[in-house]
Regions:
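Bacterial N-terminal signal peptides that target proteins for export
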Residues: 1-7
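Repetitive helical segments and hydrophobic/amphipathic motifs
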Residues: 12-13
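C-terminal motif of bacterial Sec signal peptides marking the signal peptidase cleavage site
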Residues: 16-19
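Sec-dependent signal peptide cleavage junction
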Residues: 21-41
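A short Gly-Trp-Pro
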Residues: 37-80, 86-164
């Protein structure tokens, strides 16, 4: 009788533990300030990030002003998402806003998603493909004719120069 009880307990324990260890096989839910974004796992074949890149791209941090490698870049080319390589901005839309970060007055169509911050004071911009934090967008400042400034962390992007 004691052996039967022990055997039944062991089976229940092993079954329960193996059920807890099963992985989610289809989708992962990313949460960001009250919103949920469901991303199929097949799209999660992203580039590895350094701890500092992860602090900005995943945890929505900000690099220190004036420290980004693309702030003063004037070469012709395309700025891509550091995490998934999606094209985000063309160099023709980049301008010097003297704000300490690269500034663009337009994105590649459909490449950037705008998400109002929880307090409504700013609008976050993220990669439309993978949800990577890029920075913030500001309207009505008068820097360019488009009256839009995408203030982007250099650390969130790579630069691919045009072929000469």
């Amino acid at each position: 009788m004691l052996n039967k009880l022990f055997l039944i307990s062991a089976v229940v324990l092993v079954t329960g533990l193996s059920a807890c260890a099963q992985k989610q096989d289809k989708k992962v839910v990313m949460q960001s300030q009250g919103t949920e974004q469901i991303i199929p796992k097949k799209k999660m074949n992203w580039n590895p990030l350094t701890p500092e890149e992860e602090r900005v791209i995943v945890n929505k941090g900000t690099e220190y002003p004036g420290t980004g490698k693309y702030e003063h870049t004037t070469d012709k080319g395309t700025y891509t998402c550091k995490r998934c390589n999606a094209a985000l901005y063309r160099s023709e839309s980049k301008f010097d806003a003297r704000c300490g970060w690269p500034a663009f007055d337009d994105e590649i169509k459909g490449a950037v998603k705008r998400i109002p911050d929880a307090d409504g004071s700013r609008t976050e911009i993220v990669c439309a493909n993978c949800g990577a934090h890029l920075g913030h967008v500001f309207l009505g400042e008068g820097f360019t004719n488009k009256d839009t400034r995408h203030c982007v962390n250099s650390i969130s992007m790579n630069f691919v120069p045009d072929k000469k």
